[in-house]
Amino acid sequence: MKTIYKNGAVYTGKLPLVEAFAVEDGKFVFAGSSAEADALAAAGDKVVDLGGKFVCSGFNDSHMHLLNYGSSLLKAQLAAHTESLEDMLACLDTFQKEHPRKDGAWLMGRGWNQDYFTDVDRMPNRYDLDRVSTEVPICATRACGHCLVVNSKALELLGVTADTPQPEGGEIGMENGEPDGRFFDNAMEPVYDSIPVPSKEEIKDMIRSACKALNSYGVTSSQSDDYCVCRAVPWQTVNEAYKELEDSGELTVRVYEQSNFTDLESFCLLYTSDAADDLIGVD
């Protein structure tokens, strides 16, 4: 059974615009005039009158960290609360109260930028986040993704002290000889590795959130790198999450994955699996 759309202004990628198109089994099978569409219609087909509306194909994001984006949407949205340090801390505190976490879970936020602070001329530090909580580990990532800050509870769990060596390709922020809660670039990896590993259902929630947000902007396909985002999560688990969402009709963005593997075994296993199909591609 086809769905026929007619009486529109449809851009197919070429000019001139056409009036109608038809979709069958999730694929475009026709584009042309409304008269041709009427002639194509068969018993049982659904016909939609576009009423002169403009239609174009969905947008593609060619550099999209989809799973990471979905994860960020489930954190405190600090980008909307970065006019001041106080605004940022209030956002984290409100998020903590409105989103109860299971035992051991960290309070996460992303999007702050000290360049926009009007009350202080510096980055936030561990002592600032301690005002939100000294019992719950907190991690707040800067808008750029190359810096984060944690509170004292998180530093305790990480085991970072004044004697912790500086990592290659990164930096642990220090003040008066003590770690101040800031981590830069490669120094961030141990922090993320210490955060409890998300379950497959939590990964599916991240993908759902990302798809919903992308669809709201008209994005229906993307190139991503999700297999190595959560290093403690096997790529197979991420792929299973995608497959299950596809099977349930919830995967509304076509994804082409960059495998980004560092070992030949995983690479060969991926390419001999059933990871790829119409909605999920791999490279």
Language-model segments: what does each one mean?
Residues 271-283:
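Single conserved hydrophobic/aromatic residue that forms the stacking wall/gate
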